Amino acid sequence: MIQPTGYTHPEGTFYMSTYDIVLLQMGYAVSDFAQVSLTGTPPLGEDGIFPLDLSLKALVYDDRHVRVAGIGAVTGLVGLEEGNFFLGRVGGVTQLCFDDACDSSANVAATALLAGPATLTFAGVGFIWRLSSWAALLLELDTLIPLGTEAGEYNGIAVLPGFRFPYRTWSLDLGFARALDVEEEPEAPVIPFIAFTYRVLP
């Protein structure tokens, strides 16, 4: 749901996604092995500040049951009084397929936001279990790990179970996130999650 997989769309595919309605993404597959994505939100508040992320995912290894992809990106905020603010982001993902079509799989992914002494790593494992042509179960375990001395307070772990309706040109994910290992019970025990993707194939 949140973590990427090793899959890249066929060359010439244009795709659009929305996460919880607010977060929007557009992307294009420049080849069978590489795709570019632009992710952001509408302007927030009176100042019109909004987050923006431009990423490139490239498939570097593709066996029948193993996919490995690398990710490079710039991410930041646009519309600040001091000027736009961007940081680099790098990551990778390995996907292990349980069948030839890779309808069911497990993946391990990690990405690092490069902020010097405040560098953060977002890592996790995910599972997709295809039940039928129209249904799949999803499960993720995600962690936020500080690598720098100035980001020690930013850490956490969460579990995200979900359900996917997978079709050829669109898919819908429904699920929720629950924080684990917290000292105090959060006001909202779970956070609902919805993601919708539509793609135009060449």
Feature names for model-found ranges:
Residues 1-115, 119-122, 128-202:
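Transmembrane beta-barrel domains of Gram-negative outer membranes and organellar outer membranes
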